[in-house]
Amino acid sequence: MAFNNLIRNLAIGDNVYKYFDLNGLNDARYNELPISIKYLLEAAVRHCDEFHVLKKDVETILDWKNSQRNQAEIPFKPARVILQDFTGVPAVVDLAAMRDAVQNMGADPAKINPVCPVDLVIDHSVQVDHYGNLEALAKNQSIEFERNRERFNFLKWGSKAFDNLLIVPPGSGIVHQVNLEYLARTVFVGKDGVLYPDSVVGTDSHTTMIDGSGVLGWGVGGIEAEAVMLGQPISMVIPEVIGYELVGTLSDTVTSTDLVLTITKNLRDLGVVGKFVEFFGTGVASLSIADRATIANMCPEYGATIGFFPVDSRTIDYLTQTGRDTDYTQRVEQYLKSVGMFVNFTDDSYRPTYTTTLKLDLGSVVPSVSGPKRPHDRVELASLAQDFSKGLTDKISFKAFGLKPEDATKSVTITNHGRTAELTHGSVVIAAITSCTNTSNPSVMLAAGLVAKKAVELGLNVQPYVKTSLSPGSGVVTKYLEASGLLPYLEKIGFNIAGYGCMTCIGNSGPLDEPVTKAIEENNLVVAGVLSGNRNFEGRIHPHVRANYLASPPLAVLYSIIGNVNVDINGVLAVTPDGKEIRLADIWPTRKEVAKFEEEFVKPQFFREVYANIELGSTEWQQLECPAVKLYPWDDASTYIKKVPFFDGMTSELPSQSDIVNAHVLLNLGDSVTTDHISPAGSISKTSPAARFLAGRGVTPRDFNTYGARRGNDEIMARGTFANIRLVNKLASKVGPITLHVPSGEELDIFDAAQKYKDAGIPAIILAGKEYGCGSSRDWAAKGPFLQGVKAVIAESFERIHRSNLIGMGIIPFQYQAGQNADSLGLTGKEQFSIGVPDDLKPGQLIDVNVSNGSVFQVICRFDTEVELTYYRNGGILQYMIRKLIQ
């Protein structure tokens, strides 16, 4: 290696380790770098082999102050990869299919194998089918196995067939919380005892949660993650780093959720897509690691690549609290201090060089929620009722629903669970304590328990139409809620544990009670969900719930009792059985109350007990049987696991490159089209093309499961692409998964229209607005359009991960020039488009688009690096990896 001269010994306790001493570069620029850039530099120095990583890459990172302005390209080799099952199943399917392709090309299929640690946590499969009783957990877990046995069998095969692949069984918790509490190393002990910082990329956009503990991590597309597993560095543009200074302390009634919603809005307003955000300032010292992890978790919602908190003394305290031993914590602290990556936030003079900075006084943060349709639309809690009421009749937008004024006061009497109640606009029909964003944070979980305790003591109850659920991100939460005596109070008002997984946060909210569903449908009610999740895009949480508010766990409990978001939070919230009027101060715990419970009941032994046997899984998991073979025995009759067609007919030669000629527009879309719109994860509509496919193979609607669970079958996923019932397509006469097949003038299901174009040999393109592909890091949001025949997307801007996924599938991302979009260019989507793709294409090149109406405009080709161009010329990143590995 080029920098072996920097290797030094480091004695820690009874052990002597090695490490790359970056101070040995004797370069003053090193000390000025943000800590996150130091992590990139250390990885480049350690991996510098003059092949994957060059000396000039090291210089580019060292010269970050200048190179950040020049779109300079660098490689990065993370220490490990993390997956969840919705993205993990298709990743393992791809790896299995790649083994077949390599064998068919006459090479050793064992070449397809992860070269770095890969952890896959099964957390996306469990749904809230049962709730509000003590049997809910066991019943939901039983149904999860019944629905997903074939998927789980496949994953268990993968853990045996591939080296370096750890499967964490279902029922263990949520991937990012398990990563934070157990999987993360903080500092790795590598080959020959070399120490280096932990870093990770994951196939879930909220991988960034780990940044809160000083581990550098972010989400990538599943396709890119597979390349990393096989030894390929990530190619990235060296990022700008926004320094976010925090000062002061949070006030007594404010939660970490309120803080993260404030930060999310501030950073989204600033515009940080493709940038690193690094937190500093004396205020950081007052935040627990759980608070920091909550802020880092919602990094995708504010659009940055990472939201990073360097390691400090509170990180060491957290590692101790979560059961890591003294050798571990000493190794972390002494190594990071040796390389200048350990921070003292109480030192006001600590101010690295940043691209730009912004500042927040924690004392200015007020109780907040975000919604009703986007996570960065923060609303002060005091204004929620007014904001919702106004949005009912305002023109349809991200904040409004477009009801007629005469329909805004509708109400209907329903009977549910033997109780009668009025259901109106704003009625809270889902109240969920869910998501790693908040269930990883003891302060807000204990606060939720304290609200429940006070409610029970006051004789209050949840409204009969509210579906309540508690889905902790790990078993540790259950331990401290039990130890504190708060769990029985949560159970008393219906917040029984429904499962250990993502559940409501990702749309696995399960069905509403029938009387509630009937009332909503018959009266076109705009009902609400209040959840402690991180996303609330249209159609994500539940197809019948149009207004969804992200809130802290105690607010989820409180609104289940109030029953409506259209209620003044500063007024009377409820009335006790003896007639006492209850206001917020009567039921809301102070930060001091919460801190006392946390100090007493969150213990290291709970973490050690929970994680001691986490890899064993349940009896059902242990009894799963799978073949111990290197090549997967595909079952043609399976509707869950199918060999993908991406490598069919592949040879060692590069495919020929062709222009896009006379393409039709499959969809003409607006702004903020999410990966949920493109490739939904939730339930499969009984009238959809995917449902027709399943029914044709003898699957009953009861067993359709979800699109997320079906991601191992490309036939279903191609049919589920753009199947979101809230999709707004300017080529269609109504909202939903339909489009205009331009040649015939017919409105068809999007999949059916795409098939017509494919059968006729006509390429398809997509027109879109700003932030195309925002949301989850869903590789099927690129794979699906590829299978539908989409050759290019022309958008005003792309979310980072989705742009990478498109390139990984050989779809070209084109970007309108500044100030232009489909409307300004007079495009309706009914035209045909021809786009020449030159053989000597360069990153960021301007390309002519010829329109059938005679006009010509130029777009920016959003291949940002030469490596991305190489992937495209190979037909995709996985095809590139196969050719590289068999050489």
Swiss-Prot record:
Signal peptide: none
UniProt xrefs under Gene3D superfamilies: 6.10.190.10, Aconitase, domain 3, Aconitase, domain 4
Record's GO cellular component terms: cytosol
Gene Ontology biological-process annotations: intracellular iron ion homeostasis; tricarboxylic acid cycle; tricarboxylic acid metabolic process
Single annotated GO MF: metal ion binding
Places the protein is found: Cytoplasm, Cytosol
A Pfam family that the UniProt record links to this protein: Aconitase
Binding, substrate: 84, 204-206, 535, 540, 697, 777-778
Positions of [4Fe-4S] cluster binding: 436, 502, 505
Reactions listed under catalytic activity: citrate = D-threo-isocitrate
Principal localisation: cytoplasm
Cofactor or coenzyme needed: [4Fe-4S] cluster
SUPFAM superfamilies found in the cross-reference section: Aconitase iron-sulfur domain (SSF53732), LeuD/IlvD-like (SSF52016)
Keywords from the UniProt entry: 4Fe-4S, Cytoplasm, Iron, Iron-sulfur, Lyase, Metal-binding, Tricarboxylic acid cycle
EC number from the UniProt entry: 4.2.1.3
InterPro entries recorded: AcnA_IRP_Swivel, Acnase/IPM_dHydase_lsu_aba_1/3, Acoase/IPM_deHydtase_lsu_aba, Aconitase/3IPM_dehydase_swvl, Aconitase/IRP2, Aconitase_4Fe-4S_BS, Aconitase_4Fe-4S_dom, AconitaseA/IPMdHydase_ssu_swvl
Cofactor note: Binds 1 [4Fe-4S] cluster per subunit.
Function statement: Catalyzes the isomerization of citrate to isocitrate via cis-aconitate. Has probably no RNA-binding activity.
UniProt record similarity statement: Belongs to the aconitase/IPM isomerase family.
Assembly and oligomerization: Interacts with gex-3.
Protein name: Cytoplasmic aconitate hydratase
